[in-house]
Amino acid sequence: MANNKSSKKRVEIGERNRLQNKAYKSALRTLMKRCFTACSAYIEAPGDEAKTTLTTSLNAAFSKIDKAVKRGVMHRNAGAHQKSRLSIAVKRAIEPSVS
């Protein structure tokens, strides 16, 4: 347990940041799930509306990942890894012959 004033403050700040990062990561995971869901929906029923939904969900997820990396919530290599996963899923949905 923290004994002096500055160490108590650091504990409070760390807890605050942990909760903020947790919320940010949760929102990020939600956007990624939406993108994967849009991929499977496009595979089931390809069309202009499904493709628009797919691209908008991909853009939103990419934006959130980039912001998470910028804020320090996620390591840049982890961000690149997640963006790669999303890109591969979208590419496979749009062009099924490419695996």
From Swiss-Prot:
It comes from the Bacteria. One of its GO terms (biological process) is translation. The keyword Ribosomal protein applies. GO terms for cellular component: cytosol; small ribosomal subunit. The keyword Ribosomal protein applies. GO terms for molecular function: small ribosomal subunit rRNA binding; structural constituent of ribosome. Gene3D superfamilies: Ribosomal protein S20. Keywords: Ribonucleoprotein, Ribosomal protein, RNA-binding, rRNA-binding. Binds directly to 16S ribosomal RNA. Belongs to the bacterial ribosomal protein bS20 family. NCBIfam families: S20. PANTHER family: 30S RIBOSOMAL PROTEIN S20, SMALL RIBOSOMAL SUBUNIT PROTEIN BS20C. This is Small ribosomal subunit protein bS20. It comes from Synechococcus sp. (strain CC9311).
